[in-house]
Curated annotation (Swiss-Prot):
Gene encoding the protein: mtnX
Catalytic activity: 2-hydroxy-5-methylsulfanyl-3-oxopent-1-enyl phosphate + H2O = 1,2-dihydroxy-5-(methylsulfanyl)pent-1-en-3-one + phosphate
Pathway of action: Amino-acid biosynthesis; L-methionine biosynthesis via salvage pathway; L-methionine from S-methyl-5-thio-alpha-D-ribose 1-phosphate: step 4/6
Keywords annotated in UniProt: Amino-acid biosynthesis, Hydrolase, Methionine biosynthesis
Pfam families in alphabetical order: HAD
One GO MF term: L-phosphoserine phosphatase activity
Domain of life: Bacteria
Function: Dephosphorylates 2-hydroxy-3-keto-5-methylthiopentenyl-1-phosphate (HK-MTPenyl-1-P) yielding 1,2-dihydroxy-3-keto-5-methylthiopentene (DHK-MTPene).
EC identifiers of the protein: 3.1.3.87
GO cellular component, as recorded: cytoplasm
Family under the similarity heading: Belongs to the HAD-like hydrolase superfamily. MtnX family.
Protein's UniProt name: 2-hydroxy-3-keto-5-methylthiopentenyl-1-phosphate phosphatase
GO biological process: L-methionine salvage from methylthioadenosine; L-serine biosynthetic process
Amino acid sequence: MSKIVFCDFDGTITAVETFAGMLKEFAPDLSAQIMPQMYARTLSLRRGVRQLLESIPSQKYADIIAYAENKPIRPGLAEFLAFLQEQSIPFIIISGGIQGMIETVLKREGLLDKVTAIYGVNLHTQGEYLQVHSDWENETELVAKALIMDKYSGVETIAIGDSVTDITMARKADLVFARDRLIDYLQAENQPYIPWDNFFEIREYLLLRD
């Protein structure tokens, strides 16, 4: 059966929480108030992330993109993407973070053209404050990951993630690689997963399994 890989970005491809870190940098007080509620799942990602982003002045957009420029990625991503290309397995990034930040990091690494598609949040900067736009918004998420996965039917789905934004993606996938907070959420729901630390490990697992 053909496969497809869906991967989070913030804290998954990046070795640090790039989007969450940016929010703490540019909206520190509101982040301290809202982020614990999102992690506890008492406030929806849709409401919380929108509220945080739309509290930031539009003139800060260039600084936001620059914030991502030096953020490190997890080891093995280039090798993992090369492996997927050899196997003709699409690699799709689905992120609740900002599209421009994702593209900035991938361009720096020379990997943007190795990614099949990127789904993230776009920001409009015409007004005084940032305005959020997402084509994949639902009742609880700004970027509804399971909804995007539905576009790609008839294949084995592999999910890679690390946190609260990846729960619906993990529930939907046939095979899940989880780390950090996502492990706790999946354990609480008795959902199966494979722990991972770097992309070399994921490549090795898929090689041995096949």
